[in-house]
Amino acid sequence: MRDLKTYLSVAPVLSTLWFGSLAGLLIEINRLFPDGLTFPSSY
C-alpha cells in the first residue's frame, strides 16, 4: 500500500514536468519558426 501511495504521488509530478517542458518546447519552436502549417511561396 505504501508503494501505491508513492506511485500516486510521483506520477502527477512527473507528468506535470513532462507536459510543462513539452509545452515550453512547442512554444519556443513556434516562436523561432512561426506559421509552421503554411508553406511559404518564396524563400
UniProtKB/Swiss-Prot annotation:
SUPFAM superfamilies cross-referenced by the UniProt entry: Subunit IX of photosystem I reaction centre, PsaJ (SSF81544)
GO BP annotations, alphabetical order: photosynthesis
Keywords (A to Z) from UniProt: Chloroplast, Membrane, Photosynthesis, Photosystem I, Plastid, Thylakoid, Transmembrane, Transmembrane helix
Transmembrane segment boundaries: 7-27
InterPro entries xref list: PSI_PsaJ, PSI_PsaJ_sf
Membrane topology: Single-pass membrane protein
GO cellular component: chloroplast thylakoid membrane; photosystem I
A Pfam short name: PSI_PsaJ
Compartments, as annotated in UniProt: Plastid, Chloroplast thylakoid membrane
Highest taxon of the lineage: Eukaryota
Function: May help in the organization of the PsaE and PsaF subunits.
Family recorded in the similarity comment: Belongs to the PsaJ family.
Descriptive protein name: Photosystem I reaction center subunit IX
High-level lineage: Eukaryota, Viridiplantae, Streptophyta, Embryophyta, Tracheophyta
Gene that this polypeptide is encoded by: psaJ
